[in-house]
């Protein structure tokens, strides 16, 4: 198969789904897929074997849940628009408002949806502000001091999101803050949604701690249904982005392998977070971006070769580095970025008209199926 291509591996996806299904059973809670991290709808038949619902944050995501997943969505949006609201209601089973003003404006049009409010516990351990939903001045959620003692009679639940690829020890501390600030309203509720960012499929995740936390929570609040809505956890380490070396250039002694993919177009979190992805067969070498220090070429003494990896766009900063390989790279050689299924295909763009990677599935029987191939028409029709 030609590169570039995202390859999702069915065996790895089913592994995650089975694990999440077992966690849901042991914690007596519902776990639903957040489309903001993963929305490859051609895989939904597999998901339906393990979960029964999804979460949406826009009309398009809500329609995807209803029309392609086959079940109404748990929907939350920072702000609903008047002209979209009725269609969102049609596609939703649960509807969470970000503010009391949005609730007042729309709740009478919400039909049979189970209504909720997003709360802000004013606590999050997410260090990168770009991904911290509880940072000072955040636009997300209602703080405890703004809630009335008696909630509106049609509010059935609270929604709280304050994690990002977090462990259960972080959730334990977050839960303490949530209960301290908001538990006095729990008797008025039917459900609570603890949001996403619970990375239960990571190898070092302490599942037993989560089970204990939920056992205690259910004992304290036996009437509350508990919901988790991770995204990354479902697609965590389920497949790579495969690229090829198109050219190798050198400037001031720095070698850059230019690839047929782009960090800014196809791996945006690498630049936004930022973080260095794992490259198969290579070792990332720490070197501060923009540093005046010379690149660590002394590491090449062991026979390795050091390269920056550059994207094929005209953005000057569309590169990352350095990686050490055990051989000199050649034009046409494949460079494989591991764990590139979550927060990639949902965030890619066609900046510069760069060819979008195809999407394929490696089935459990070893066959490789092309799910989507992108063409010039996809780029052109965005401007139509």
Language-model features and meaning:
Residues 29-191, 205, 213-216:
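Active-site-proximal beta-alpha core segment in soluble small-molecule metabolic enzymes
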Residues 35, 162-163, 192-201, 230-233:
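Glycine-rich beta-strand-to-loop/alpha-helix junction loops that act as flexible
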Residues 123-125, 164, 200, 234, ...:
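Feature marks short, surface-exposed loop/turn motifs that line or immediately flank catalytic pockets
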Residues 167-173, 201-210, 237-243, 324-325:
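Short glycine/threonine-rich loop-to-helix capping motif typified by GTGT followed
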Residues 230-384:
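Charged (often Lys/Glu-rich) extended helix/loop segments that serve as interaction or gating elements
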């Amino acid at each position: 198969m030609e590169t570039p291509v995202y390859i999702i591996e069915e065996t790895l996806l089913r592994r995650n789904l089975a694990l999440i299904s077992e966690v849901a059973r042991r914690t007596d809670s519902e776990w639903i897929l957040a489309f903001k991290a993963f929305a490859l709808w051609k895989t939904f038949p597999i998901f339906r074997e393990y979960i029964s619902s999804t979460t949406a944050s826009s009309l398009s995501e809500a329609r995807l849940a209803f029309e392609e997943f086959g079940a109404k969505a748990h929907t939350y949006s920072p702000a609903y628009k008047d002209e979209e609201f009725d269609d969102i209601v049609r596609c939703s089973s649960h509807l969470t408002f970000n503010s009391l003003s949005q609730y007042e404006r729309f709740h009478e049009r919400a039909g049979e949806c189970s209504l909720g409010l997003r709360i802000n516990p004013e606590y999050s351990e997410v260090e990168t502000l770009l991904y911290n939903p509880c940072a000072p001045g955040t636009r997300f959620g209602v703080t405890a001091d703004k809630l009335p003692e008696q909630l509106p009679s049609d509010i059935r639940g609270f929604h709280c999101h304050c994690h990002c690829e977090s462990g259960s020890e972080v959730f334990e501390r977050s839960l303490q803050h949530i209960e301290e600030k908001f538990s006095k309203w729990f008797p008025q509720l039917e459900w609570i949604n603890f949001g996403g960012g619970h990375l239960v499929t990571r190898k070092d995740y302490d599942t037993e701690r989560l089970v204990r936390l939920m056992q205690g929570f259910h004992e304290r609040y036996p009437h509350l249904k508990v919901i988790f809505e991770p995204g990354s956890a479902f697609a965590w380490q389920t497949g790579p982005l495969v690229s090829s070396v198109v050219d190798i250039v050198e400037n001031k002694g720095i070698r850059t392998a230019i690839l047929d993919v782009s960090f800014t177009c196809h791996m945006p979190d690498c630049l936004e977070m930022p973080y260095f992805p794992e490259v198969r067969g290579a070792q990332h070498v720490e070197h501060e971006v923009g540093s005046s220090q010379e690149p660590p070429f002394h590491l090449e003494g062991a026979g390795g070769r050091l390269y920056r990896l550059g994207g094929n766009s005209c953005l000057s900063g569309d590169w990352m580095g350095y990686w050490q390989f055990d051989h000199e790279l050649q034009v046409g050689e494949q460079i494989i970025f591991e764990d590139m299924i979550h927060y990639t295909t949902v965030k890619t763009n066609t900046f510069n008209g760069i060819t979008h990677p195809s999407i394929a599935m490696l089935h459990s029987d070893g066959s490789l199926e092309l799910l989507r191939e992108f063409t010039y028409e996809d780029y052109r029709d965005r401007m139509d």
